[in-house]
């Protein structure tokens, strides 16, 4: 039994890993062929690139082909990520600029492009910033009154002179004349020579509010030109 088991084991090993030595037709075994050290190496097969040229759309590298249904790989860590849209810097208005804008807003809440450009020249602010200020001011007025704010006068003929060339770059903050009257504009519903009290002070109303605004703008403009002449 032991001999039969060993024969079966040898037969199984021989069946699993058969060894067939190379033989000459005459029955003699030939030695293994080894390349001579003095002979040059076999040239590269030139037919290999031809097979690739037949299929130009195929790439030999396996990484170039992306499986269907998968997204392409994301950017590497070294590449900079797209920057988020930056928020516009908020413009700060001086007290003189706000007084002039409020003065014009009390006359007309929808200034045209020409009036906005002249305001920009006087306040040294961009015209786009002045337009945004009037939009925000109208929204604030609607929230306070609960209805659309009506302008006190339909007259838009406020004449604002543009400053001389080369003076726009100078940032001036002159004191607005008659600044007390700007914060206490008389009530348009009052007629005649009524008064508008605020605290312990009282101010006489003017016959025409639009003319008063125009005179204040002229005084403010003259004050700017006088300040420019001191330089």
UniProtKB/Swiss-Prot annotation:
Superkingdom in the source lineage: Eukaryota
What this protein is called in its record is Homeobox protein MIXL1
Region of interest (Disordered), ranges: 23-93
The UniProt annotation gives the DNA-binding region as: 86-145
Where does the protein end up?
Answer: Nucleus
The conditions that induce or repress this protein are given as:
By TGF-beta. Regulated by Nodal in mesendoderm morphogenesis. Regulated by FOXH1, which acts as a negative regulator by recruiting GSC to promoter during early development.
Query: Pfam families from the xrefs?
Result: Homeodomain
Q: Which InterPro entries match?
A: HD, Homeobox_CS, Homeodomain-like_sf, MIXL1
PANTHER family (alphabetical): HOMEOBOX PROTEIN MIXL, HOMEOBOX PROTEIN MIXL1
Alphabetized PROSITE patterns for the sequence: HOMEOBOX_1 (PS00027), HOMEOBOX_2 (PS50071)
Describe, from its UniProt entry, the tissues in which this protein is expressed: Expressed in the primitive streak of the gastrulating embryo, and marks cells destined to form mesoderm and endoderm. Present in differentiating embryonic stem cells (at protein level).
Principal location listed in the UniProt entry: nucleus
- What Gene3D superfamilies does the database record attribute to this sequence? Homeodomain-like
Q: Which UniProt keywords apply?
A: Developmental protein, Differentiation, DNA-binding, Homeobox, Nucleus, Transcription, Transcription regulation
- Where are the compositionally biased (Low complexity) regions? 76-85
* GO CC field: chromatin; nucleoplasm; nucleus
What biological-process terms (Gene Ontology) are attached?
Answer: cell migration involved in gastrulation; digestive tract development; endoderm development; endoderm formation; endodermal cell differentiation; gastrulation; heart development; hematopoietic progenitor cell differentiation
The record's listing under SMART domains reads: HOX
UniProt cross-references to SUPFAM superfamilies, sorted A to Z: Homeodomain-like
Bias (Polar residues) occurs at 54-66
Q: What is reported when this gene is inactivated?
A: Mice display defects in mesendoderm morphogenesis and patterning during development. Embryos show a marked thickening of the primitive streak. By the early somite stage, embryonic development is arrested, with the formation of abnormal head folds, foreshortened body axis, absence of heart tube and gut, deficient paraxial mesoderm, and an enlarged midline tissue mass that replaces the notochord. Development of extra-embryonic structures is generally normal except that the allantois is often disproportionately large for the size of the mutant embryo.
